């Protein structure tokens, strides 16, 4: 008897379930989102940050600012990876490409260029975006970069004017500056060449010390190199080296001398002279916007002072820049933006360039 009751109950549940299923209304199409797309059309991208990862108070965090802005503005979805070593780039690029679910895969920093080119060739139907390195010969890659020399040129002009000037309390009479270079790559050399050109444009007799740190995640070595430059007489040291830059800031604090960084998130109001600004977050926002609007194209895009992407900034710093110094920097900016001054792109070009270009 119990078996019969159980059988009746099972049959009843099955029939009831079928009845409910057959009685459901036809599913309505999804409502479009605020940007005019259905949820299925929302841009989805993957991004691989540079070595050092998030929390570096520098380059990666600036990129991540753009990621968050793009997600908020366009409702974009994303996945990300934080490699701890250069050897991981290819594996992570391949992992995202294998998934086949991203509108683009974004690689951050020049160290990823070779891995990206290799993987992009193997996945011709997958779009890739390269940040800060020129790749213009692949049909599925769009590369975006700021002018590396232009990012550092105006801070170089400021440094050339500030050294030996007693209106800047942490300067000294030695007429020596320093630049801590992340790695021996075209990008890093281009950055350094901009600073050196700016300093020599404003101050032809200045001596500029340079050292290679060897990586973007080595603040200990960076501090040691910066201390050497300060001890040799430099009163201002500039750096663009991801989380390694933290070591240069520590050295500046210890020696009570000036430092110039590249992120508004990494400043020390007491010893920072300026920040060499590159609005890298705009690259991410503009890239996702092009996917959202269907205007994405492969090739190479470079932006600088003329587009408002590169500049110097003293926001949040204790330093007071005299009006006559600001006027000279403004004049230099106008000449670069207009094309009157075309900057050198590598260190071996600086001396010849400076011999022909001097501030009036």
Model feature map: region roles:
Residues 17-21:
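C-terminal motif of bacterial Sec signal peptides marking the signal peptidase cleavage site
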Residues 1-9:
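Bacterial N-terminal signal peptides that target proteins for export
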Residues 9-10, 23:
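Intrinsically disordered, compositionally biased charged tails
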Residues 23-360:
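A residue-level marker of the well-folded mature domains of exported/periplasmic proteins
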